[in-house]
């Protein structure tokens, strides 16, 4: 088996995790208590969904996941929520005091006390796998736990499981909406780790997803639940081929191979189509070319940046539902002839496609309509640098005055780490710029 372990860190990671596991259970017909009426081979772990769920002798399906937070309130919601019987209590790890939006607390002081416990639980999950393929790590980098403890866990996973892939689903601060003054610090310090210790990181930001909910689903005031359900559709589409047997499967390591031209250039944009409410879906049949065009629209991007300002290095299109390869090829040819979608000279073809015949499921009573076919795109575009330059600019404004720095130093950080992380990001922005500007003949070396 090629098992995947999911690690959900901090409030954002846990709440996105809840939405994902709710959706996986629906897709596989797993009940809230972990039983699966349709599973005829009870206790036999050769079904495709066993990549994400382990099976007990009694036929209970347990997610291969851990949830970690430095304070208990968010995890307590899982402990008392609808899916409380799905998880083993040891998979839900919470501390007593939170990271107070401080990277240094999550990484050095409070986080240090809990990290060994987390790694012990991960080790138990890993020992239960026959061929562990890698980790999915969910966190936000604006807060203290997601950024600090998230980085610490990634660093330790690199030591313990060097060769295993690590995919991050990372929620970045939004351009306009802020939940903490020190978000730029936490993000820059955390990205410094993501650069080193993840193989692929998919960037998400709440503001972009708010706009999609408002525009496409007519939700006037989207809640985190609305956002997370949309995010979970993307993550589900990415992992469909690991959980179901499909036509053209895409493996986690294949993402890496196809999307990452240079090790550090691994921050991805994602988009999903159709995002459509039940009222509208009733009147529209969305064809493969239509949904394929939709995922290339700037307004479909799940992070606030405009792909037209950059060039694509590669993109993965994951179709699911009623889709045949012939339609996909035709749609891709049409996109290639469009002048709005530009590729860097070095990768003129740049498309990797996957098809899975399992149609998308939706949460009953949710906002998304049940559709026959959907597509999710993960793309590597140089415009992603916009996300970093925005955060770097805010970082610089605060750091020039050394504002709030004492909170970090007081928790055992050194001031040098700020400038080191900031320089690392400056180099990353430059690297993106070079890839976008590259001609066919000038070789640029990238560290």
Curated annotation (Swiss-Prot):
One of its GO terms (cellular component) is microtubule. PROSITE patterns: TUBULIN. It is an enzyme of class 3 (hydrolase). It catalyses: GTP + H2O = GDP + phosphate + H(+). GO terms for molecular function: GTP binding; hydrolase activity; metal ion binding; structural constituent of cytoskeleton. It is found in: Cytoplasm, Cytoskeleton. Pfam families: Tubulin, Tubulin_C. It comes from the Eukaryota. Its cofactor is Mg(2+). Keywords: Cytoplasm, Cytoskeleton, GTP-binding, Hydrolase, Magnesium, Metal-binding, Microtubule, Nucleotide-binding. The active site is at residue 254. Its EC number is 3.6.5.-. SUPFAM superfamilies: Tubulin C-terminal domain-like, Tubulin nucleotide-binding domain-like. PANTHER family: TUBULIN. Dimer of alpha and beta chains. A typical microtubule is a hollow water-filled tube with an outer diameter of 25 nm and an inner diameter of 15 nM. Alpha-beta heterodimers associate head-to-tail to form protofilaments running lengthwise along the microtubule wall with the beta-tubulin subunit facing the microtubule plus end conferring a structural polarity. Microtubules usually have 13 protofilaments but different protofilament numbers can be found in some organisms and specialized cells. Tubulin is the major constituent of microtubules, a cylinder consisting of laterally associated linear protofilaments composed of alpha- and beta-tubulin heterodimers. Microtubules grow by the addition of GTP-tubulin dimers to the microtubule end, where a stabilizing cap forms. Below the cap, tubulin dimers are in GDP-bound state, owing to GTPase activity of alpha-tubulin. Belongs to the tubulin family. This is Tubulin alpha chain. It comes from Avena sativa (Oat).
């Amino acid at each position: 088996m090629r098992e995947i372990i999911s690690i959900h860190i901090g409030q954002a990671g846990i709440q996105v995790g809840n939405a994902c596991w709710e959706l996986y259970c629906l897709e596989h017909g797993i009940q809230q208590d972990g039983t699966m009426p349709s599973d005829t081979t009870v206790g036999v772990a050769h079904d495709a969904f066993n990549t994400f769920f382990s099976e007990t002798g009694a036929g209970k399906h347990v997610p291969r996941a851990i949830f970690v937070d430095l304070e208990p309130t968010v995890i307590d919601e899982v402990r008392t929520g609808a899916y409380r019987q799905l998880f083993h209590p040891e998979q839900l790890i919470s501390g007593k005091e939170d990271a107070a939006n401080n990277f240094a607390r999550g990484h050095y002081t409070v986080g240090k006390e809990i990290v060994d416990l987390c790694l012990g639980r991960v080790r138990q999950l890993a020992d239960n796998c026959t061929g562990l393929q890698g980790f999915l790590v969910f966190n936000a980098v604006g807060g203290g736990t997601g950024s600090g403890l998230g980085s610490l866990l990634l660093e330790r996973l690199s030591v313990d499981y060097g060769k295993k892939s690590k995919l991050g689903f990372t929620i970045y601060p939004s351009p306009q909406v802020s939940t903490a003054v020190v978000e730029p610090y936490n993000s820059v310090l955390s990205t410094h780790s993501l650069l080193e210790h993840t193989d692929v990181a998919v960037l998400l930001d709440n503001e972009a997803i708010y706009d999609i909910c408002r525009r496409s689903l007519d939700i006037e005031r989207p809640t985190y639940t609305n956002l997370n359900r949309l995010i979970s559709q993307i993550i589900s589409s990415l992992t469909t081929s690991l959980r179901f047997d499909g036509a053209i499967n895409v493996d986690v390591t294949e993402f890496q191979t196809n999307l990452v031209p240079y090790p550090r250039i691994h921050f991805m944009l994602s988009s999903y189509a159709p995002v459509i409410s039940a009222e509208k879906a009733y009147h529209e049949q969305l064809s493969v070319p239509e949904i394929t065009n939709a995922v290339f629209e700037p307004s479909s991007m799940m992070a606030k940046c405009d792909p037209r300002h950059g060039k694509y290095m590669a993109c993965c299109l994951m179709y699911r539902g009623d889709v045949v390869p012939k339609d996909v090829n035709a749609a891709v040819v049409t996109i290639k002839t469009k002048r709005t979608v530009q590729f860097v000279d070095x990768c003129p073809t740049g498309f990797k496609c996957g098809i899975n015949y399992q149609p998308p499921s939706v949460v009953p009573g949710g906002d998304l309509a049940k559709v026959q076919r959907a597509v999710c795109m993960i793309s590597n575009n140089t415009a992603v640098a916009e996300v970093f330059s925005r955060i770097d600019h805010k970082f610089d404004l605060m750091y020039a005055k050394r504002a709030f720095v004492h909170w970090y130093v007081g928790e055992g950080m050194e001031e040098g780490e700020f400038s080191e992380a900031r320089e690392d990001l400056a180099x990353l922005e430059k690297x993106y710029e070079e890839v976008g500007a590259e001609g066919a003949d000038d070789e640029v070396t990238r560290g």
